[in-house]
Design a protein with these regions (language model features):
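P-loop/Walker-type NTP enzyme "switch/lid" segment
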Residues: 1-43, 138-139, 144
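Structural beta-sheet core signal
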Residues: 35, 57, 93-95
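Inter-motif core of Ras-like GTPase G domains
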Residues: 42-63
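Conserved C-terminal guanine-recognition region of P-loop GTPase G domains, centered on the G4
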Residues: 69-88
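Beta-strand-loop-alpha "switch" segments that mediate conformational coupling across diverse proteins
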Residues: 99-102, 111-142
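C-terminal boundary of histidine-terminating zinc-finger modules
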Residues: 136-155
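Histidine-centered active-site loop/cap adjacent to the catalytic His
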Residues: 149-170
Length: 171
């Protein structure tokens, strides 16, 4: 891993979804664990959702992406309802890759449409915008806030992280 080679902290542990996810989560005890699973692996996604306290859905600002989110929620709806009956799980959505021009309507329209979708409990007002810093930092194996701590991308990420993890990111 690039982070390890460059001795950048924190050293992030990455586990394969081929392993049993539930066992991996139990081994981490009370710490925060982020599981990133693509919709192409529906079995792993359902397993991750069943173990999750929160499901975070990033949605690009377009009608097609709102429809895709609606379709996804419909596909996993029964599984999510069963999980919610057993706990306090939340499904949270936010607009990702929003246009940097605040007058572009699609971002606002997407946020409004997400609020109407059944299955989404919270729509965050915090957004990540389409910024070159995100793309460039990813190719370096770093987060935008690590490469350019004072950048707009870093500030947007900090704001989103604080909304999601106020006890960790907000301190």
């Amino acid at each position: 891993m690039l982070r390890r080679e460059l001795e950048i902290k924190p050293d992030l542990e990455i586990h394969s979804v081929r392993a049993v996810l539930k066992d991996q989560l139990v081994s981490h005890g009370d710490c925060e664990v982020l599981v990133d699973v693509g919709a192409a692996n529906m079995a792993a996604m359902k397993e991750a959702m069943a173990a999750a306290d929160r499901i975070l859905i990033p949605v690009p600002p377009s009608q097609a992406d709102v429809w895709a989110t609606q379709r996804f929620l419909h596909m996993v709806g029964q599984d999510m309802e069963a999980v919610k009956m057993n706990g306090n799980q939340q499904t949270i959505a936010f607009v990702n890759r929003a246009d940097t021009n605040k007058s572009i309507r699609e971002t606002h329209e997407t946020e409004a449409a997400l609020r109407m979708l059944p299955g989404i409990d919270v729509v965050l007002p915090q957004r990540l915008r389409m910024r070159t810093s995100f793309r460039r930092s990813l190719s370096e194996g770093l987060a935008a806030f690590e490469m350019w701590p004072r950048s707009k991308a870093a500030e947007e990420f900090r704001i989103l992280a604080t909304a999601l993890y106020p006890g960790i990111a907000g301190s």
